[in-house]
Amino acid sequence: MEKIWLKSYPPGVPHDVNPEQYRSVAHLLEESFRKHAKSPFSVCMDRWMNYGELERLSGALGAYLQGLGLQPGARVAIMLPNIPQFGVTMAAVLRAGYTCVNVNPLYTAR
C-alpha cells in the first residue's frame, strides 16, 4: 500500500515512530515540548500555536482539572470540533493523568 500522506510530511519528520519508546502519550508530549518548543503545533485561521504554547496552555488547564478533585484515571469527555483547542484540551487531560473520552460534537439526541 502506498502511503501517499507521507509526501506531505515536512523534512526531518520520521515516517514511523517506535511506540515502545514512550510509556504513554503524555510522555511523548513532554518530549515534544522539550525538543520542539518553538516549532509549530497547529494553525487555524492564520493563528499559529507552537509546542511551547501548547505546553503552557495544557499545563494550566490540567492544573485546573486537578483542582476540581478528579481522581487519577478519571474519564474526561471532550466535545470539541477539529480546532486547536481540542489539542490543548486533550494534552491537558492526558498530562493531568486522566483518560480522554472523545465525543463527536455532531452527535444528536437520536
Placement of each model-derived feature along the sequence:
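AMP-dependent adenylate-forming
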Residues: K3-W5, H27-N50
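Conserved AMP-binding/adenylate-forming core of the ANL superfamily
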Residues: V17-Q21, K38-I83, G87-L94, T108-R110
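Short, functional N-terminal and low-complexity linear motifs
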Residues: M1, S24-S32, M79-I83
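Flexible, non-catalytic linker and terminal segments flanking ANL/adenylate-forming cores
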Residues: M1-Y22
